[in-house]
């Protein structure tokens, strides 16, 4: 079996994209799974294709596992870690990074602008719901 996962684009405008991810785990988890394909996001009104995204806000509810959001690169770089542990139960919150310009891609060797996700400490029926607000960079 495999984790039951969904990805949904809630908004995809000229400057901002909002995406939502869910997972109900069967205990197998996810490892560096592409969640945001930057090249699949809508082009700007001027016809430019986005090259990178900056994480402006994160809303999350994580139960029983940890979730790492990663900048895809030759060796992925962790952008944020959400959740806690099975002992912590559900951990939810909102992180707003707009006051300082957001969490920017580190441009590590081999970066491509995509955002990946890795879970750890997952067991059967652990779960997450994550919403990202991304600013597109052209």
What spans do the regions from the language model cover?
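C-terminal interaction-tip segments
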Residues: 3-13, 119-138
């Amino acid at each position: 079996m495999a984790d039951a996962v969904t990805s949904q684009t809630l908004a995809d405008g000229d400057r901002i994209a909002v995406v939502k991810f869910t997972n109900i785990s069967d205990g197998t988890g996810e490892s560096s799974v592409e969640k945001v394909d930057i090249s699949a996001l809508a082009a700007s009104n001027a016809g430019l294709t986005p090259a990178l995204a900056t994480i402006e806000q994160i809303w999350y509810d994580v139960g029983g596992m940890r979730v790492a959001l990663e900048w895809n690169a030759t060796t992925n770089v962790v952008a944020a870690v959400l959740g806690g542990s099975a002992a912590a139960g559900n951990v939810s919150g909102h992180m707003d990074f707009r006051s300082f310009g957001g969490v920017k891609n580190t441009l590590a060797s081999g970066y491509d602008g995509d955002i990946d996700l890795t879970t750890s400490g997952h067991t059967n029926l652990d779960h997450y719901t994550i919403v990202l607000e991304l600013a597109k960079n052209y």
